[in-house]
A protein has these predicted regions:
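Charge-rich, low-complexity N-terminal segments
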Residues: 1-138
């Protein structure tokens, strides 16, 4: 198979959560408590020197707004919809924007979905579930 000729999916959605991991190496890292472990446990202990990452997430939202893509902020991250290339470019730009704010290490967790049988938005998926729940409660 010629893998170079494989096109990316026409449309996709991605849920991602960008975590600014550290602006500088935290003092506890030198005490043998590796930064990676802290980054994986609790957002309050991720080493940015500030328990709030709201300003960094606000910057991500500004990047997404400028992208023109459909996106939805939720409590655990953001859902972004568009072509594969557009969505991945937007996530990359979000990383770059947060790096420009002085964050030297960023980790994003992403869950990506794509369909080839029909067009379906994240909103369509939610509406379908709400419809099922409403019909079951009657």
């Amino acid at each position: 198979m010629d893998y170079e000729s494989i096109a990316t999916p026409e449309a996709c959605y991605v849920d991602f959560c960008l975590l600014p991991v550290s602006k500088q190496l935290p003092a506890h890292a030198s005490a043998g408590l590796g930064v990676r472990r802290w980054a994986d446990t609790d957002i309050e202990q991720i080493g940015t020197g500030n328990v709030s990452v709201a300003e960094d997430i606000a910057e991500v939202q500004r990047v997404l707004k400028a992208s023109g893509l459909k996106y939805t902020l939720h409590s655990a991250g953001t859902t972004v919809e568009g072509s594969w290339d557009e969505v991945m470019a937007a996530v990359g730009k979000a990383h770059a924007a947060v790096h420009r704010r002085g964050v030297v290490r960023i980790q994003s967790s992403m869950r990506v979905g794509s369909r080839t049988d029909k067009m379906q938005t994240a909103e369509d998926k939610v509406k379908r579930l709400e419809s099922l729940l409403a019909s079951q409660s009657e």
